[in-house]
Amino acid sequence: MILTVTMNPSIDISYPLDELKIDTVNRVVDVTKTAGGKGLNVTRVLSEFGDSVLATGLVGGKLGEFLVEHIDNQVKKDFFSIQGETRNCIAILHGDNQTEVLEKGPEVLEQEGQDFLEHFKKLLESVEVVAISGSLPAGLPVDYYASLVELANQAGKPVVLDCSGAALQAVLESPHKPTVIKPNNEELSQLLGREVSEDLDELKEVLQEPLFAGIEWIIVSLGANGTFAKHGDTFYKVDIPRIQVVNPVGSGDSTVAGISSGLLHKESDAELLIKANVLGMLNTQEKMTGHVNMANYQALYDQLIVKEV
């Protein structure tokens, strides 16, 4: 079973409009509300793929109750309740544009943060792989993910970590390393304080920087150009076919689902990388974020090429 962790989930509300009129009333007929957050996108894709998944994280108030109720019934759930209210994230779809209004979310009390660590520690007993995704809510220290990784390491569970900014920096500087990180070029540039290109020789050098020491897998998305990856001392390039993209949002989360599944099933390097890329690509072909059509899985799988470089 895979444990997904979403520390700052949301109710994602979609308002489709023909036109967004400013300083007047806009009436919405077709409102969509879903359980949102990067970790919950991972959860959905794992469930659709057919893997057993347990979802956890922080929820609060009536919106938190709504969120848990609207996670697929096939998914096991064991969230931790806090005093603050789970946030709303609103997307206004008008014409070809998308305007987002994102609430900050609850401020987590120090004791709640400590109590969740104990909650997380207990959940580790029943899972084989951990996937941690997204931002930290206000109130938690910047090195909180390092604490989660430490507990998972102590329990012997591999961790796939998908976060960015100060939270990722804190983990990289910690002695407690995740099994997998999944930065893109922009995030690599942020971490190193210099521009990083998609040149394979440069990426090889970058991924051997001391900052990344001790991390077993580093998987870098190159968008339409595929993926570059380092596993131990071996480097890989994944070539992908051109596809029709409908909605790219959530493709990174779907990739995390594939990585986590590959670790769960102890697949070869090539199998893990292909699965991760295929699930990410399938997500881009759907309107709904964090959703894959498994009927198209094998045909796409057969088109991907993994090369050692």
UniProtKB/Swiss-Prot annotation:
This protein's UniProt keywords: ATP-binding, Kinase, Lactose metabolism, Nucleotide-binding, Transferase
Listed GO MF terms: ATP binding; phosphofructokinase activity; tagatose-6-phosphate kinase activity
PROSITE patterns documented for this protein: PFKB_KINASES_1, PFKB_KINASES_2
EC number: 2.7.1.144
Alphabetized Gene3D superfamilies for the sequence: 3.40.1190.20
Pathway(s) this gene product operates in, as recorded in its UniProt entry: Carbohydrate metabolism; D-tagatose 6-phosphate degradation; D-glyceraldehyde 3-phosphate and glycerone phosphate from D-tagatose 6-phosphate: step 1/2
Reaction equations catalysed: D-tagatofuranose 6-phosphate + ATP = D-tagatofuranose 1,6-bisphosphate + ADP + H(+)
Signal peptide range in chain numbering: none
One Pfam family in the UniProt entry: PfkB
Organism superkingdom: Bacteria
A GO biological process held by the record: lactose catabolic process via tagatose-6-phosphate
Entries under InterPro entries matching the protein: Carboh/pur_kinase_PfkB_CS, LacC, PfkB_dom, Ribokinase-like, Tagatose/fructose_Pkinase
GO cellular component: cytosol
SUPFAM superfamilies listed in its UniProt record: Ribokinase-like
PANTHER family, per database record: 1-PHOSPHOFRUCTOKINASE, 1-PHOSPHOFRUCTOKINASE-RELATED
Similarity comment: family membership: Belongs to the carbohydrate kinase PfkB family. LacC subfamily.
Protein name: Tagatose-6-phosphate kinase
Gene name per UniProt: lacC
